[in-house]
Each structure stands twice: as structure tokens, then as C-alpha cells.
Amino acid sequence: MIIMKSIILLLAWFLTKTQANMLTESLYLSEYEGSVVLNIIDKNLNGISTLSIFNDSTKLQEVRYVASVCSLRSGSFNITCNVITYGTYHVRMFLSGLNMSAFDLYRLRYVYVGLRDAINYNPKYAEAVMAPFALIGNNNIVTIKLIKDGDNITVGCGFGNVDLSTVNTHASKIGRNINPRFMVGVYTNDSNKLIEDDIYSRYTDSESAGVMRKCNLNEVKTTPQEDCIQPFCTKGTVYGNNLVYGSRLRCFSRTRCSQRSRTVPQSVPWYIPSGFTGKQFMYLDNRLGYLLGLDLTTAIFKYTPIVVGHIVSEYLTGIMNYKRLSVRKGPNIDMRGIIGGEIKMILIRNYRKMLDMSGFTPLPVNGCYVTVIKFIGDKRVFNRVWTPSNNTDDGEEHVFVFHQKRSSNIRDYTLRIFPDSGMDTEGSKYTMNTITDVGCSRETHHKSVYPATIKKAIERFCVDQPNISCEYVKDIDRVDINPCGCKQRANRCGERYSNNTLKATIEFEVPKIYDTPYTCEFLGYKSVNSLTFDSPPPPPTTTQAPPPPPTTTQAPPPPPTTTQAPPPPIVINTTAAPLAPITNATLPPSDVITPEAVNLTDDTPVVNEPVNSTFINDTDVLDDSPTTSAPQAPGIVGIIVNKITTTPAPSIGRAPIPPPDVPVEPPRSIPTTNAPSPEEDTVVLSKSDIMRRFLIRLKTRDGETVDIYTWPELNLAPFKTLSYAGIGVVSFALLFTILVVCLIKFSI
């Protein structure tokens, strides 16, 4: 009897221990698919870190913990990432497809570290971001230190962990055109400390390479060595991430910039050893002060890791790094998707099978912004709608609508549109820049300036792919291109596309510049379990009820036409898995987007009430016209931003809604609280929700409606898959213990 009881107790302890170990293993992710190993250590710091990891298997798991230190190990190569948090800041790092050896960092596809003020998203705080290429430094250690007011800054760089006070010493040993490219924050010229509510910038010269210099408002600083150094002077906004890559800045000064200084140099010194091509690409909007990126060495990195800083008052979407680079031909990198305003995404070429979990849906913060990227094999449909933020007082409230479409045989493209001489009036000039294969022996950077009313541009690019060679850019206003650009591919370019035949088309439009800020409203979101992106619009259903018979006062319904049916109304399907409310696990209370009224039915008008004063302009008059009934797609759950009309926009590459094949369940409401309690963090999405695509519907002021399909993203639906495993294991342990005890009792 004693032995039997001992066995029972031992079994119960073992099951409980197994459950605890399972959760621990889930936290450490040692069993995680791929070669990602994440160690989360509680440093008991004053703050919460959100560390999210997903890989090519599209599995996504979120671990929230108090501070963290992560170690990524594979083979003999170790990467240590020290993440330090302060206060209520959140840190996120996305790592995907990690498979490292001694010098093979090329599978580090995602690196994303964002700092948020979880209380009110105060722009006075700076954000520190650290690139994986800093791993080349001492002992392959990267220190990511998030800074707040008064903190000293020490971040890793090519020399290892370098303090600001030692930057000049390091720079002087290598050359004058060296910036501490990984130093982030807002500094004075004589202090390491962050200064709040002031505007500073950094410029490069031979004596003070990379030192942050105070920038008076609306002042343009120049040096004898560099003619076009434009500080980030924008009245009313503090830019904490004034990173500078390369020795020359892309200048947007209206008075003191020369055309000859508008492009980055062919090569500049760099402190990453052996093989760096010396080609840095950096674009700055003088109103945004936004760094976009750079390329790296081919000898050390076969995939190009990139980290981008962002304006701290805005939301950093993330980084996607896909393209495997050719050591022989040099890096092949493009910085993508920029239209003057908020800059949210950087894409790197890749022609392998893309990640299924590749959609990023940043939430609107100060304005309306949605970015969605869909990968279907080698084909990408890329739709964007956004406006600049409204946190400046220089009249920069604009609406930008950007639609892109590529034929199935064209696998990549790049489009950049920058404000060239200001965007104060309609018809302002914009500059489109394309950068192609940076490993080519000749400059492939070119510009085309065109009015805001131009609708189409064709972009030229060279790709390091056997079946894709060379394209070019052309617009109806002006053409300034290098016909092929890549010398070593000139023959193939000529053979495949004689006379530069058009093979890729990018359609864009900047419809108008408005006097009032563009406002946006989050009404709800729909999930689509399966989509056919390239299929034609769904045929008219034959199960609809017949129209009522005509009366003497009502004309008979018109005969059916071949025009496309209007988009369906937003109805929440209760058959879908429970959706997690947006909690402070990933968003500050001010950014929680669970709407006040999202229980939309066929006869419910779209309620255009401000959801959040952070990004809704209460003074803007919104159209309160109701939506129109339409057949409901199956399993739809979704995001609708701003007003909805029944007139589909001429959106390029928009995926049609699949025809309904299941009855529509009664709608349900989404929690409407804007300040969720910490307990709500435990609400999770099921694994099926991870693969469920989302529909986003946007409407511009010009009446265009844009439907975008994407995948859920952590910003939209924080969840923990650990909860299900833990509950299941605990329940099984308890039930098994009770069963054994009962059996023993009855046997006795």
C-alpha cells in the first residue's frame, strides 16, 4: 500500500514537473522548429520586454517577460543579445529562419527592435536599435540599450561596444568619412546624455565624425567637406533616431542643397572588415529625419541584415530581409516602399519561397497607415495607403495612395518617392529614386522627377537571378536612366529584353494634398481562412432571395450586370476562434484599437466616431453614410480603417473575396475597452488564427476603397500559444491523478 501511494505521488509529481518543464521548454524554445534557441532570463529589471520569434514554418510564439537576455546558438557560433528595458518600454525582436555557422549569419532574416512608451507614446524618448552586423565586433556581442532621459548611451558597433566619448578615437584611426553608425539617440556635442524636447542632428567632418550637433530650427548645416548636410530640423517634432550612414546625406533643403550632392558616394571607408562594398544608401526626409538603411559586406554576410531606425513618435513596422547575396557579384539590396510621409517598411530581394507569415499590419497612430505585404510563391502583391503623421505644424497633412502591380514573371521591384521641394501645394514635385544592384561596377542610382498627378512609373532593376535580368524605370514626365546599369549583366540584359522592353509596371498616385489632416478610424477586422488571390471576382450567387415583385410605386429591379459586386459588409463570424483584445502586452493604452462600435451588420451604419485621440482628428468631418448590404464571405473577421463606401477603388492587385460557402453566423462585438487590465494578456489566439488571413479595408478622401488581405501580426493580435499547452498538461495531470487515486481506493 505504501509503495502504491508512493508511486501515485511520484507519478503526480512527475506529471506536474513535466508540465512545468514543458512551459519552461516553451519559454526557452529549445524544441522550436528550426535552429532557434532562445534563453529568457529574468533579470528582475524594472520593465517588461516582449520577445517574439517566428520562422519559416510560420509558427509564431510570443513570450512576455520582465527584461530578457537572449542567446542564439547554432554550431560553434554564438550570438548574445543583451536587451535592457526601462520603465514601461517594450522591446521586440523578431528572428526567423536562424541557421548559423561560424560566419554564416545570412539566415538571420528578421531583426526588429522597437521601443515604445507604453503609457502615452511620448516622442521625447529616443529609441535605440542595433543591427546584427554589429556582431562583427568584440566577442560577437551586441548590446541593445533602450535609453530614456538622462541615460548614458553605450551601443555596439563595428568595434564592439563603444561609448560615444570614444567614437572620435575610433574614427580617426580609420578615416574621416566614418560615422558611429550604430549610435542612436539625441545627444549634445559635449555630453552623452539624451536631451528631451530639443532637436539635434549629426554631421560628418574630419574632426568630429558622427558627433551629434545641435540644430537650430530650420537651420541648414554644411561643412567644407560635404556640401549638402541637411539636419533634421522640423519645428514641433523631436527625432530621436538621427542615424547617418555614409558620408553624404540626401538633402532636401530648399535653399542650400546642390544637385551634385544628392547621391551617396560610390565608396566610403567602413569599419566592418573585409569585403564591404562601401555602398551605403541613406535617405532622409528633412521633415521626418528618417533613416532607411544601408547595405553590408558580401564576404561576411550572405544575407544582408538591416536595421532601421524610426521617428520615436511613430510606430516601427519591421524589417524583412530575404535576398541571398552573391559573394562573386556583390550585394544586391534595395530599400523599398517610400512615399514622402511615414516610412514603415524595408524590403530586401528574395526569390525563394517567401514566408507565409509575411504580412505586417501596423496600427494607425498619428494618422492613417496600413502596410500589407503578401507573398504567394514568387509573386508579391503590395498595396499601401498612408498619410504622414500629423505631429508637425508645417502644413504636411497629405494623403498618399500607393498601388503596385507586377506581372507574375517579374519578381521584384523598388519604388521610392520623396518630397523634392516641399509638399505645401497641390502639384508639388516629387522625386522617385531607384537603387539597383549595388555590386555592379557602375552607378545605378538615378532619379526621375515628376508632378504629383503622374499615375505610372516603370522601374528598372537588375537582379541576381538566372531567369530575371534587367528592368528599367520610366515615367511620362522625364526619363533619366542607365539602360542596363549592371555591366557584368549587360549581355544577358540585352538578350532577354532587347531595347529595354517594358516588363514591370508600378502604378502610383498622389491624388491630392488636403488642408485638413487625414483622419482614420478603426472599425473592426475580418479574418479570411482561405483566399485565392489571382482568381477572378466571385460570380453572382444563385442562392439569393428573389427580388420583391414590382409595385405601382416602385420600378422593377434592374437586370444583373457584369460589373463587380460591391464589397461585403463587415460581419464578425462567431465560428472563428476567439480573438484576443489588443492589450498592453504590445500596445500602450492610447494605441489600443479595439473600437467603440464594431458590431456591424447589414443594416448597421458605419459609425465614424473617434476611436483614439492619438490618431483621430476630432475636427475632421467624416461621412456617416451607411454601408450597403452584400453577400457575406465565409469566416470573415477584419480591419476597416476610416469610412467605407460601396465603390471599390481601382486597387491594383487586390484579392477578391471568395464566394460564400457557409452560412453567416450572427455577429459578435469586439471588446471596446481602451485600457485592458493585465489579466487580459492571457487571452490567446489559436494556432489556426495564426494562419488566418486578414482583410483590411481603407477608404481615402477621394472615395477610393482599398481592400487588402494579409496575415495577422503581433501588433494586431497578441497571443501566447503557451497557454493552451499549459492548460492541457495541467488538466491531464489532475485528471490522471484523480483517476489513479480512485482506482486504488476502489481496489482497496
UniProtKB/Swiss-Prot annotation:
Its main location: host cell. Disulfide bonds: none annotated. Glycans are attached at residues 55, 78, 99, 152, 189, 390, 467, 499, 573, 584, 599, 612, 617. Residues 745-748 are cytoplasmic. Residues 531-574, 650-680 are annotated as: Disordered. It is a single-pass type I membrane protein. Keywords: Glycoprotein, Host membrane, Membrane, Signal, Transmembrane, Transmembrane helix. GO terms for cellular component: host cell membrane; membrane. It is found in: Host membrane. The keyword Signal applies. Residues 535-570, 656-669 have a biased composition (Pro residues). The chain crosses the membrane at residues 724-744. Residues 1-20 form the signal peptide. Residues 21-723 are extracellular. This is Putative transmembrane protein ORF88.
